[in-house]
């Protein structure tokens, strides 16, 4: 241990104790401070500053992680937290902040914390909550988990300097979640929420981890929108998605009502560009609205299995073909009726007819996507037999082949069995369920 202290000469408060604990807690073949020191020597360079040296030490521990010695990932996390804690302490010292109440007051003044926390809780209650904090629970983090949490979820000032520890983050979330409980038991709920989160008995979705306790406290993850077949409606849906993504939500967008490529616009034949061009707009919005750089937006786009643009839709994320018809950052999903699978089971060489929803609405006076089950099947076959409606006829096996090819290359499309979902819908009196969201991947 003496040699280690000399060779790892980094001016970080608590580092010596951290190394001693690593040496004590991680023993056995493949562990030990001598191994860490040996790897650190290979990374150390003359003239390294303290920050670079600490990063090299963390990297040394992280790269020792293997199938045979998995616990090095926890050792790396301890070193990562040691460096982070020093950075936070330095920031707070410069601001003259002592204690959790002063910290929350400062963060509220800076617009980094929601003022509702101080409105709901007294100083005494926040000081009581501060007593719940248990830094020993930081030892439960793996390096990858802690590194992600420190980069994305703890509160930073406007210059990206951290001002909150992971345990304070969990406590802040707990204060938010419990604030509407009755006063006589509210602090018990704060303690209960904090214990469950900090012991990693439960976890929260990204919007809750990121937004609870902050001014824009949007906690929901999943949203759904039906994209109308109009210019105004399409852009309104894209704007809705941008607003949802801005605060951490993901969205499922149903494009089954949008007219297909070559369809009429104001009576002019062949004017419509189809759904792919609009989906590219959603794709670019997901990339652009990246939640203050925290993470890229997420959208699943849904199209019916009978839509004329299905073949191009199934190739949205594949690596071959015209890149102008690609959308690599969204998650395509297909809404399948039972009829498709029944026909595929009977004979894959059968024809499957693709049609434009706008054309069906114009000719037949109803929206095929607005029904399911036997009524949908009856109307679909009626449309197939109507010569006034143009069809794009493909073989079932070609559709299945495109699905398999895309699934192998990209893991998509997600499969949404619309008849099964709508039969199970307890609120069918409120209308049809057109699609789901990103959760369809489960």
For each feature predicted by the language model, list its residue ranges.
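Extended catalytic cores of very large enzyme megasubunits
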Residues: 1-442
């Amino acid at each position: 241990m003496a040699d280690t202290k000399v060779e790892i000469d980094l001016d970080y408060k608590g580092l010596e104790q951290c190394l001693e604990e690593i040496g004590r807690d991680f023993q056995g073949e493949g562990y030990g401070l001598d191994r860490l020191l040996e790897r650190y020597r290979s990374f150390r360079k003359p003239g390294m500053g303290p920050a670079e040296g600490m990063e090299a030490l963390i990297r040394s521990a992280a790269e020792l992680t293997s199938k045979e010695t998995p616990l090095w990932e926890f050792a790396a996390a301890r070193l990562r937290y040691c460096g982070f804690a020093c950075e936070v302490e330095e920031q707070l010292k410069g601001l003259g902040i002592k204690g959790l109440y002063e910290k929350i007051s400062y963060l509220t003044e800076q617009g980094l914390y929601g003022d509702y926390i101080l409105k709901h809780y007294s100083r005494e209650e926040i000081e009581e909550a501060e007593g719940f904090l248990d830094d020993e629970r930081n030892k439960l983090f793996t390096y990858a988990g802690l590194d992600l949490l420190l980069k994305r979820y703890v509160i930073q000032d406007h210059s990206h300097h951290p001002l909150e520890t992971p345990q304070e983050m969990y406590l802040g979330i707990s204060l938010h979640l419990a604030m509407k409980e009755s006063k006589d038991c509210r602090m018990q709920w704060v303690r209960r929420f904090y214990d469950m989160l900090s012991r990693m008995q439960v976890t929260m979705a990204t919007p809750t981890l990121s937004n609870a306790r902050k001014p824009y406290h949007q906690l929901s993850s999943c949203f759904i929108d039906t994209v109308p077949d109009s210019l105004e409606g399409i852009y309104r849906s894209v704007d809705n998605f941008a607003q949802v993504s801005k605060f951490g939500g993901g969205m499922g967008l149903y494009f089954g009502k949008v007219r297909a490529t070559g369809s009429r616009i104001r009576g002019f034949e062949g004017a419509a560009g189809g759904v792919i061009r609009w989906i590219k707009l959603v794709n670019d919005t997901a990339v652009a609205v990246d939640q203050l750089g925290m993470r890229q937006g997420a959208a699943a786009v849904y199209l019916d299995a009978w839509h004329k643009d299905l073949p191009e839709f199934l190739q949205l994320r594949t690596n071959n073909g015209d890149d102008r018809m690609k959308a690599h950052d969204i998650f395509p999903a297909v809404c399948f009726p039972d009829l498709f699978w029944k026909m595929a089971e009977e004979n894959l060489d059968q024809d499957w007819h693709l049609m434009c929803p706008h054309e069906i609405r114009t000719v037949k006076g109803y929206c095929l996507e607005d029904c399911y089950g036997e009524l949908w099947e009856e109307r679909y076959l009626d449309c197939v037999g109507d010569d006034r409606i143009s069809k794009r006829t493909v073989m079932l096996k070609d559709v299945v082949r495109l699905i398999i090819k895309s699934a192998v290359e990209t893991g998509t499309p997600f499969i949404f069995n619309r008849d099964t979902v709508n039969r199970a819908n307890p609120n069918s009196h409120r209308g049809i369920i057109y699609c789901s969201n990103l959760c369809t991947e489960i």
